[in-house]
């Protein structure tokens, strides 16, 4: 029988049943989907665009390749990858949340980005793709919301081609003490107020702050990726470690 720890997961600072967490996370993103892009700009002062640009630069994606933008949400990375892979390539924007997927699809279609993109509602823990299928997988600000992160990493490894790479862009642990103090004050006191003012939803942004604190730190996530099978795993601290980009390869 599974232990109690195996049956539960963190939802922010709370411990809940795993199936309950999936429902609760879904409710958060159904709530914030319409204001997601605006809130990203406000919360990060636009810096999220620099973090994502760095992820693109580290991806090594080339023409005619197949890319999975997992937890791709409103499609920022998908839009860039679509141009990089060209007509002979393919980008799959996958997200477990139907509301986020809908916003992403409408956003990209309104920009005329259509031809080489497919949309799939998928759970990162059980990806509905063949083995050795993608040249590159990215998951941007999504892994911390996954219930079983180790299972998801193994699933990503399975569908990645030999020679392919995974990039995980995620909030992490600041490496400068003074920055950490300021960041905590901002996250727990200011961020929920912005969420209430802009999206009428302080609770979802309180969960965001808590989920960041519960997410594995840089070295722990590096070890988790290695345990899932990835080789040459390394990471880059961005903005003093507020965000980290982890990269691993499948050889």
Curated annotation (Swiss-Prot):
S-adenosyl-L-methionine binds at residues 74, 95, 123-124, 140. GO terms for biological process: aerobic respiration; menaquinone biosynthetic process; methylation. The keyword S-adenosyl-L-methionine applies. InterPro entries: SAM-dependent_MTases_sf, UbiE/COQ5_MeTrFase, UbiE/COQ5_MeTrFase_CS. Keywords: Menaquinone biosynthesis, Methyltransferase, S-adenosyl-L-methionine, Transferase, Ubiquinone biosynthesis. Pfam families: Ubie_methyltran. It is an enzyme of class 2 (transferase). Gene3D superfamilies: Vaccinia Virus protein VP39 (3.40.50.150). The keyword Transport does not apply. It catalyses: a 2-demethylmenaquinol + S-adenosyl-L-methionine = a menaquinol + S-adenosyl-L-homocysteine + H(+); a 2-methoxy-6-(all-trans-polyprenyl)benzene-1,4-diol + S-adenosyl-L-methionine = a 5-methoxy-2-methyl-3-(all-trans-polyprenyl)benzene-1,4-diol + S-adenosyl-L-homocysteine + H(+). PROSITE patterns: SAM_MT_UBIE, UBIE_1, UBIE_2. NCBIfam families: MenG_MenH_UbiE, PRK00216.1-1, PRK00216.1-3, PRK00216.1-5. Belongs to the class I-like SAM-binding methyltransferase superfamily. MenG/UbiE family. Methyltransferase required for the conversion of demethylmenaquinol (DMKH2) to menaquinol (MKH2) and the conversion of 2-polyprenyl-6-methoxy-1,4-benzoquinol (DDMQH2) to 2-polyprenyl-3-methyl-6-methoxy-1,4-benzoquinol (DMQH2). This is Ubiquinone/menaquinone biosynthesis C-methyltransferase UbiE.
């Amino acid at each position: 029988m599974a232990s109690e720890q195996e049956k539960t997961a963190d939802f922010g600072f709370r411990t809940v049943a795993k199936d309950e967490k999936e429902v609760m996370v879904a409710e958060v993103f159904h709530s914030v989907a319409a204001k997601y892009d605006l809130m990203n700009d406000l919360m990060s002062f636009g810096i999220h665009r620099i973090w994502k640009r760095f992820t693109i630069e580290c991806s090594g994606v080339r023409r005619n390749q197949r890319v999975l933008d997992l937890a791709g949400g409103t499609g920022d990375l998908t839009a860039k990858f679509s141009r990089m892979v060209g007509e002979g390539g393919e980008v799959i924007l996958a997200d477990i949340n139907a509301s986020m997927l809908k916003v992403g699809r409408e956003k990209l279609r309104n920009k005329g980005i259509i031809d080489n993109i497919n949309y799939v509602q998928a759970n990162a823990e059980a990806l509905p793709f063949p083995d050795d299928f993608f040249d590159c997988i990215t998951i941007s600000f999504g892994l911390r919301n996954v219930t079983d992160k180790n299972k998801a990493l193994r699933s990503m490894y399975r569908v990645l081609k030999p020679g392919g790479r995974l990039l995980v862009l995620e909030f992490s642990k600041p490496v400068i003490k003074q920055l950490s103090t300021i960041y905590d004050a901002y996250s727990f006191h200011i961020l929920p107020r912005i969420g209430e003012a802009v999206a009428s939803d302080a609770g979802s942004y309180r969960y965001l702050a808590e989920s960041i604190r519960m997410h594995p730190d840089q070295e722990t996530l590096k070890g988790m990726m290695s345990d899932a099978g990835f080789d040459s795993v390394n990471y880059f601290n961005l903005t003093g470690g507020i965000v980290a980009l982890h990269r691993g390869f499948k050889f």
